[in-house]
Amino acid sequence: GKYPVTPVFPAHRFCRDMLERELVAAILRHLKTMPRCFAWKTHGGMYGTAGIPDIIACIDGRFYAFEVKQPGGRLTRLQEVTLGKIRAAGGAAYMVTSVEDVSAAISAEGGSL
């Protein structure tokens, strides 16, 4: 047509966000099967707090924070700083790319699956 069509969101960004959203959902489903686990997704975007990890959980009395990335994804500087502050306060904080990463993190902290 005579008017160019420009996507509002670049396709690569949409695909990445979809994958990360699917990973977050899969991780939450996994966590909700664990005894003594309370987990929730934090809300990013315009109304969320920048740098806060995607998933927060209390597992058997231990605080966990998981920043979910697609495989090959990288943390922003603010996310790195936030995970470091959580660790400094005694919490467990991880960047994860799969349900298996979450299981490994919980095991590394001495938790049971």
What are these regions (language model features)?
Residues 2-113:
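Catalytic phosphate/metal-binding cores of nucleic-acid and nucleotide-processing enzymes, i.e., regions
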